[in-house]
Amino acid sequence: MTYRISQFLTISVFLAVLSPSMASDWSEWRGPARDGISLEKDLPVKWSPAGENLAWKAPYGGRSTPIVMNNRVFLQNTAGKGELEQERVMAFDADTGKLLWEHRFNIFLSDVPPHRVGWASPVGDQATGNVYALGVGGSLLALTREGKVIWERSLGEDFGLLTTHGGRTVSPIIDGDLLIISGITFAWGPHARGAHRFMAFDKRTGETIWQSAPGGRPYDTTYAPPIIVNINGTRLLIQGASDGVVHAIKAQTGEPVWKYEISKRGINTGVVVHGTTAILTHSEENIASSEMGMVVAVDASAKGELKKENVKWSVYGWQGGFSSPVIDGDRFYHIDNGANIAAFEVATGKRLWLENLGTIQRASPVLADGKLYVGTENGKFYILKPSATGVEVLDQDQLGTEADPEEIIASAAVSNGRIYFVSDANLYCIGKKTSGVTNQGPPVEGLPNPNRPATHVQVFPTELMLKPGDTARFRVRLFDEYGKFIREEANATWSLDALKGTVANGQFVAASDGGLQAGSVKATVGNVSGAATVRIYPPLPWTENFDAMAANTVPPLWVNATLKFIVRDFEGSKILVKTTEGSSLLSRARAYFGPSDFSNYTVEADVRATTKRRQQGDAGVIAQRYVLTIYGNSQLLNLEPWQPETARTVSKPFAWKPDTWYRMKLQVENLPDGKTRARGKVWAVGEAEPAAWMIERIDPIPNRQGAPGIFGNALAEVFFDNLKVYANK
């Protein structure tokens, strides 16, 4: 019917049972079951910023939901101003609000502006006490309970994760031993196609366990929270993505199960599930209607691409594209973009009632103790008592003033009898000053069955970068048709594809004379196979003039180059071209061609600009997360680690003539005092290299490592040739 409106994965067990000390934690954005529901009781019905039921307030704002774990509150936000601005994770005592520690980390090689830093929420791992964060620039970090770095990955350099002006970043989640994130990536080889890609990492080591790209062409970056549910024995991760599709994949393997296309734009709201009914929402263009926005219920037990017969009901014209819904028995509540909250029947989609809360809405409501806790972007925080016939406002408080409100963009967290939430100015804790454990944990999976037939072979780590002569150890896990772990397999048959070296019993030894190469390590168990991809980079120096490559191809090991750069014949030789074709997601691009742990090196390249409709493109070289860029239209030479934050950019005029080759040179050096020096020069090809550096920056918050690369912004085509990368002398 249609209405219209104007696992814990180890060898021995799959998921660990939650202990009572863990049971009151709110360790992820959407809570213990990732559905915005808390089972706690005796929660506050009113409070006041002036003091009533205010346990504490801390002067730290944010735009993402705080999490609570082991009596600590963790918040991700921005720190510092201007050239010293960074992203950070903060830890507070949950009883007092005392700041315990903070860890700051750099933003680099990203188009995200400063005011959108701290978009994602951190996630806590109840088994280890560790905390994980995905920054707006693509840095993925694992921190101990005390804020010490365990491991760090650069997803932009390693996988081509796209970060844009919108800042939208998906919050990570934990499932057993896996840390799972997603986003738009343009990687290399088998993963080069631009897509919304799900990626799982070993939470203890940071090794890549699986990658999955079940969708089509992405429209824009998104931040929809995933939910993991058991549907007829299959543990599904369900999430809206950047291709306008809601995808259901097996949580422990990434194998696609079903998908449903609902929009011509990316999806930012979370899915909620009641039995085998999944409720999906958005506020953008529809596929089957000219109206904007919809709510739709689909059969979550279906397989493949969902069709009309898999749709239980749909409501067109409801524009709830930021706030996620929450289920309350046989009804659910949802807030549209204009801060109108409505109740709908789960079974039919019939709207039961509607109430206005403000004018702008981003935060998702939390259902706890029969009440809804939610803030609005207008600075009002509500405690509501919903029913089948309407909603009672138990309490509403204005934070800041109506003229100058404290904006509330993030959702609340419920833990130990208290409500935690953040505005753009403060972190609040309301409720009892002393806590009590009353919540329950999510459902627990049973033990694996080692005798079930295997339908999926998982080779891990599934992505590695090595040097010639290196040795790597791979392992194999088997899963059944439901995506459940069976056992770790020691008797797989191993083989190599396009790699020089040897492999036996899971141990791969790269040929010492193999040079630059890429391929896969394959494991077969019975008639089922799986593989891991490997890139092998020889020691510096490197040179590349593209002459050995076929025209209309992409350098095979380059990250974030497909559909953005292409090899072309030009004046009797080969060059690399930053093309102008494609969407806005393709026009600006940073391509990487080496490991992200390189340091103390120099990058050189020839560049040449063209003009089109009186526009001239931009070109740059990248070393250790610094970019030396010539801007065509503005005729400037810039040295910058994070282009939108202009206080750290060094700039000088530079006359860049079109249709003329220039040589660019960027050197980055880690200094003994802990700072980093980046310096560059540019000169016309055929002229002598200038003795002096033209531009320099000493960075007080240095990037101490990073991949070599190039940058192109194709207002008109930009050419590259004769690349060199070598260690500093």
Q: Positions of the model-derived regions?
A:
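Extracellular glycan-recognition surfaces and repeat-rich motifs
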Residues: 48, 551-579, 583-587
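Short tryptophan-centered beta-strand motifs in secreted/extracellular beta-sheet-rich domains
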Residues: 546, 603-605, 659-672, 678-682
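Secretory/extracellular carbohydrate-interaction modules
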Residues: 571, 579-647, 728
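Short S/T/G/P-enriched beta-strand
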Residues: 437-473, 477-481, 531-541
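Extracellular carbohydrate-recognition regions
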Residues: 24-28, 533-561
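Flexible glycan-contacting loops in extracellular carbohydrate-active proteins
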Residues: 689-719
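Noncatalytic, solvent-exposed loop/strand surfaces
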Residues: 22-458
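Short, aromatic/His-centered strand-loop micro-motif at the edge of beta-sheets
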Residues: 643-665
